[in-house]
């Protein structure tokens, strides 16, 4: 198995990620480029380490999280499936069949809320990705344009975002601080209810409980 550091040397992968980010930026989506996947990858590695997964599993979680969104360079629709297939074409020789299958499953599962997670790599990837809510993800600069889109509004209003793991209490907690002068907290739930369901299911697969704290109030 190659490492994330080695995988990042593939020029096709990096180009696809950069084009995915640029394509969605032009469509006024939140960031899905290198900044997003670098953060999600680091978060996935940390979750995997904190819950006690093996070194190899930690590496796989970091890799799946880094690669989960690059299919967007082709299309937003079915980007998870396209990303998984292209990943297989790029890296088939670098992983065992079992490793490759788990990585492809994680890339596909990150965007299918009805899927059941059969391995920890998919579950960790979901938690790392769906918890990435923060002001820095807003690519639009015009505040009037930001105010017109609920996803941009909620991300822009999120001044602080941290995902923590308490191994002793078996809790995985997302802590957010939202500027309620810009958006009411209810708008967060209007767009992220499905994501929180993802996170709860993923945490349960790992033997943990998912908690959500917004502005010092525990909501889940």
Label every PLM stretch briefly.
Residues 29-32, 116, 187:
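Non-transmembrane, amphipathic alpha-helical segments
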